[in-house]
């Protein structure tokens, strides 16, 4: 979550003489220079989820398009449940990171286009479960009629699910739903148990699948 931390980590990897460095940039512009140092030291640099100049190759997810799909799934749910009446919506984003801001913008644009009568009553940052829980609990106090929550990631979605369970208990209304990405174990369990997660847009699989794929690509490239 901090570009300076990533710079320090990459510098340490350079000093240690690593063969390959895999990075998911918090801020790609901020780490371009140190990644160039790695390349100049004959270290392969693999960038995941962003486009960088100073990398051996980039494995890119189109984050805006991913956000549009999350928002589209939420809009379909809104239109099915509420029609022209619309409903109150919460977005749990993370604008501190450029790629997640792109994803958030995709969600907002899709909601505006495809569910124009829905009202986004709160937009709060939530990158993990704790932030999602705290943000959603606070939002529900001010907006108890929220029906849809759109999240840029699985952590915020898990926290939102816990907050909604705290509000509604075991009675899960069929007109309330969480829409997100990241196929976490928690999201799968929520859907299997009939909780508040309605849709997870999974492009790359869970964190372990992503890790396996990017590692395999990196090793094949470096071979």
Model-derived regions, located:
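A residue-level marker of the well-folded mature domains of exported/periplasmic proteins
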Residues: 1-223
